């Protein structure tokens, strides 16, 4: 067996944000997955896996079900992160409070932190306790407006390519009317650009259609904005890589997430791919007007 780093993904996040989908997705990608791992046993488990030489990538779910979770998870994650023989990523799944409460009500489950009280109380306490953990995550995914199928596709893009060591960019379009994406590192508002929505022959098309792309990008304002955006990213992306960031989510927003944001996101994705970056394009709200 060729000596190489063992890939380790730690899956955590808000209760109800999609950890079960993440488990099944990584299993489908060939990861050996352990649910409800005690943080204090994680390094010992990793050593056993390395000694066995049976697996080259593993995932561990760590969440509040484990006693002492909030006190132990970050110190143990940092210990694993420092090891030269491991490629460790911390994945944090999130969603807004309304979505989490709705999911709990659909399943008729109580929240682990408020088994006898209001679901909202448990969600708010969990979010407060998770602040430091989320800030240390390598990858944060907001599942608020994401179907299980689309979450699986995003995880496949993140963990199914190459060796997983390269910097990875997700370019997302969205509509402000549906809420800001919680997982965005950079948010650009393009609502100031000419809006194809008011052109009858373009209204029912999207930024995936050449006619809409041409309409948006023929504007001098759009051309100038895009040049500045590219210049910004030419400085920012190498800086993020130098700081050790493994992935970056760039969110482009317009009113409904159909025309302008999709156009800019597509163009930016194509240009970043030409420069050699690994890019996934995700149009969060493009189906909502249908």
Swiss-Prot record:
GO terms for molecular function: ATP binding; GTP binding. ATP binds at residues 13-20. It holds the Pfam family PapZ_C. Keywords: ATP-binding, GTP-binding, Nucleotide-binding. GTP binds at residues 63-66. Displays ATPase and GTPase activities. Belongs to the RapZ-like family. This is Nucleotide-binding protein Lreu_0386. It comes from Limosilactobacillus reuteri (strain DSM 20016) (Lactobacillus reuteri).
């Amino acid at each position: 067996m060729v000596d190489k780093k063992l890939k380790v993904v730690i899956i955590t996040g808000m209760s109800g944000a999609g950890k079960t989908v993440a488990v099944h997705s990584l299993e489908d990608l060939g990861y050996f997955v352990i649910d409800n791992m005690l943080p204090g046993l994680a390094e010992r488990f990793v050593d056993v896996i390395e000694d066995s030489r049976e697996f080259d990538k593993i995932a561990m779910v760590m969440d509040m079900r484990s006693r002492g979770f909030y006190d132990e998870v970050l110190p143990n994650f940092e210990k694993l992160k420092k090891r030269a023989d491991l490629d460790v990523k911390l994945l944090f799944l999130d969603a807004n409070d309304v979505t989490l409460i709705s999911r709990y009500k659909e399943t008729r489950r109580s929240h682990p932190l408020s088994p006898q009280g209001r679901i909202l109380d448990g969600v708010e306490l969990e979010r407060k306790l998770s602040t430091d953990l989320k800030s240390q995550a390598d990858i944060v995914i907001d599942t608020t407006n994401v179907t299980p199928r689309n979450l699986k596709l995003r995880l496949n893009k993140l963990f199914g390519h190459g060796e997983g060591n390269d910097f990875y960019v997700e370019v997302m379009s969205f509509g402000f009317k549906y809420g800001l994406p919680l997982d965005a590192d950079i948010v650009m508002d393009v609502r100031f650009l000419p809006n194809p929505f008011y052109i009858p022959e373009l209204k029912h098309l999207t930024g995936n259609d050449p006619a809409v792309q041409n309409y948006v990008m023929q504007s001098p304002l759009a051309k100038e904005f895009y040049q500045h955006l590219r210049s910004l990213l030419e400085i920012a992306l190498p800086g993020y890589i130098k700081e050790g960031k493994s992935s970056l989510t760039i969110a482009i927003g317009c009113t409904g997430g159909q025309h302008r944001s999709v156009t800019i996101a597509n163009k930016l994705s194509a240009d970043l791919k030409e420069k050699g970056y690994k890019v996934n394009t995700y149009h969060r709200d493009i189906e909502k007007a249908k």
